[in-house]
């Protein structure tokens, strides 16, 4: 039995800080396994790794989890000092999404201490900030829980029932390679023209990566760029747009070397997980906000396998991926209480 508010706050601060101290940009999630295994043991939870490298912290009856609290172990690149200042935690992933992950682990512990009637787990997935291999593995193996709460920052009062889709286009341009005094245009010039035409054509397009050149006095023969676009329309419309954009690049001696698409997701507020989250927030005296988030998450993938899915978590999403990521310990605790209550509601509904 969990004994006091001070005890829970202490657990939240220590757990979250331990997670933040381990730098885990996409591809290095295994660094977090020893920390998660130690905390699982301390909190009386089971611990295992699946074939994709996803971490599973389990509670309740044996078997595949019926209810899953799904977070991710990776962060975007960019090391930040992990520290606790007063009651605020700072560090890479404080908001996206180790703060929510800590809240989910604590929430599972709280629910388990009261007794869970169904198999439940925190699933720490790999590669969410990349191509979501952890989520795709769950779906392809048929191991997706019946009810899923995705742990992403929603301000602690938001229930996200949708995410936009994402279209990523890799562009490669060629041009004259030689001395910069040569009048012939290099690949970088071609790339600038190509990107200008894309940005003029569609305001949703954003250039996220550029690579060209080796020296100030050499025009590069090859230049690369990545363009990302978020959208609400059906994925087939986005693919048609990508095809048109790529066709238009040939006049600039450029082409699309790859196109990747993540479809948008929009679930019903009446699904069991969303209803349980709303009920838990209201019980806690919080007025729920129903939101459709502007980015993407593993919810875009996992929604293929279940309709009972929604996202919720502590933290200001505006701080995600910034150098100012921070989260209050109290917000982690409040979210843990919401997760715990939601787990109980969903288990009791079976």
Curated annotation (Swiss-Prot):
It is found in: Cytoplasm. Pfam families: M20_dimer (PF07687), Peptidase_M20 (PF01546). It comes from the Archaea. Zn(2+) 2 binds at residues 96, 129, 321. Its EC number is 3.5.1.130, 3.5.1.132. The keyword Hydrolase applies. CDD domains: M20_ArgE_LysK (cd05653). Binds 2 Zn(2+) or Co(2+) ions per subunit. The active site is at residues 74, 128. Keywords: Amino-acid biosynthesis, Arginine biosynthesis, Cobalt, Cytoplasm, Hydrolase, Lysine biosynthesis, Metal-binding, Zinc. GO terms for biological process: arginine biosynthetic process via ornithine; L-arginine biosynthetic process; lysine biosynthetic process via aminoadipic acid. GO terms for cellular component: cytoplasm. It catalyses: [amino-group carrier protein]-C-terminal-gamma-(L-lysyl)-L-glutamate + H2O = [amino-group carrier protein]-C-terminal-L-glutamate + L-lysine; [amino-group carrier protein]-C-terminal-gamma-(L-ornithyl)-L-glutamate + H2O = [amino-group carrier protein]-C-terminal-L-glutamate + L-ornithine. Pathway: Amino-acid biosynthesis; L-lysine biosynthesis via AAA pathway; L-lysine from L-alpha-aminoadipate (Thermus route): step 5/5; Amino-acid biosynthesis; L-arginine biosynthesis. Its cofactor is Zn(2+); Co(2+). Belongs to the peptidase M20A family. LysK subfamily. Catalyzes the release of L-lysine from [LysW]-gamma-L-lysine and the release of L-ornithine from [LysW]-L-ornithine. This is Putative [LysW]-lysine/[LysW]-ornithine hydrolase. The lineage of its organism: Archaea, Thermoproteota, Thermoprotei, Desulfurococcales, Desulfurococcaceae.
